[in-house]
Amino acid sequence: MTNIIGKIFSITSFGSSHGKALGAVVDGCPANLELSEEDIQIELNKRRPGTSALTTSRQEGDKIEIVSGIFEGKTDGTPITGIVYNTNQKSKDYSNIKNTPRPGHGDFCWMERYGIYDYNGGGRGSGRITIGHVIGGAIAKKLLKTQGIEITSHVVQIGDIKAKNIDYENLEENIAKNNVKCGDLEAAELMEELILAKKEEGDSVGGIVETIATGVPAGLGEPVFGKLDGDLAQILMSINAVKGVEIGLGFESAKSSASEINDEFYYDENDDGTKSIKTKTNNSGGILGGMSNGMPIVSRIAVKPTPSISKIQNTIDLEKEENATIEISGRHDPCICPRVTAVAESATAIILADHMIRGGFIHPTNLKKSI
């Protein structure tokens, strides 16, 4: 089982949905980064359950506790361990799925590979394990901000409802105005109605989440097998329920001509008289040849509907070796996309932080030497 990602700035994720705790060990963060539990708590609150009618009713405070790696309010260059204790498990809700794998979940695959599976809340296969992503990502985001890099994720589609009028200039402000985390306020209302309708039906719905990273310098990435977009795709696919990743124009580029989508370069005059190299369009999503080109890095992930629904579904009984049906109880999100935004931001930050150190943009041991 692989629970580690990153070559220098690395994250080791641990814990399960109904276990005692979850968290992450962050290694490779340079010393002298100002960091507090509040910095991480802000990010955890973005993915915390039970915050609106659009999420699971499971009430968890998700309070972070840092147990290593901080000295006098700053990172000291040693591994940073962050822990979140589970407080509201209801394992009895899962007793009926011990031998009946849930359709759409990884239960069957875990049983086949390991021969044992913590079925309570999905165990290590639960979306709750993304707490580890967010702990690592919160630290990565704080590190990246010292270099002027900002990351924002937002919902651009729920079901067949698309955000068509996104105000990117006021994106974060508009995201904060609705529970869907969508930058198009009119579309957000329709999305919320759809999610609540699916919830009432005992069903769920999927969508698409877009992530934008600005301020990223040109030259991040290591071809051939260390491409920046390759590493981003890997960590984004590690997020539960993600079934597809695209960078920039993505799959739309397959039906276009090069003359239509090639990003043409130009020199842009800065206020101080210097020049910056930019592209007139950003169809490549800020990455060419596996390396950043200085434009915003744009990715989108396809998030499938939460497979835990209350409708009766067909499955099998592994103990009796016969066909069966299952009706899933418990507390589940009718749409996971609003909470995935926080995880997508964190996942992106982890990879960018790792590549910033690998590329020599951030000093590997002492942040003071980078600023």
Locate predicted features:
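N-terminal, positively charged regions that mediate nucleic acid binding
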Residues: 1-58
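Internal helix-turn-beta structural module
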Residues: 10, 308-371
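A short glycine/serine-rich beta->alpha loop
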Residues: 10-13, 118-129, 218-222, 282-288, ...
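Glycine-rich anion/phosphate-binding loop at the beta-strand->alpha-helix junction
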Residues: 13-20, 202-205, 209-323
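Alpha-helical support elements that line or immediately flank enzyme active sites
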Residues: 20-32, 128-149, 230-234, 295-297, ...
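Glycine-rich, N-terminal phosphate-binding loop and its surrounding beta-alpha-beta segment
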Residues: 44-103, 107
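Short acidic, glycine/tyrosine-flanked loop/strand segments centered on an H-E-D-like triad
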Residues: 97-123, 314-332
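Glycine-rich, mobile lid/loop segments that gate access to catalytic sites or pores
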Residues: 113-224
